[in-house]
């Protein structure tokens, strides 16, 4: 089977990560969450991770250039080229979308689908209010589920 290439977009708390895992189980495509990749790069103390962390610690968004570079590194990996991908949380901006388009053209990869997930704003607030993160592994979960 040919690798599939998907992008999931939607607000935080809509379930992009959950759907990415389900799509991996069904289609074999590698979920790539920008948040997870940030945490991994920070934990590994890479140059990009340290740079990203300097913004995160100040409560600022990580600049497009750093985000794009981190995601490009993963998208170019042998595993992702072999399995395909489900992007979660990337692209978030027009600049990131343009960079993704350029990168995929360079890799001779075409997106199969962009899926927009929608949710009632009140549900988003409820989900995010109960969202917690494990300090050891970085997993994000809802207080009601653990």
Language-model region placement:
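Glycine-rich phosphate-binding loop of ATP-dependent small-molecule kinases
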Residues: 1-146
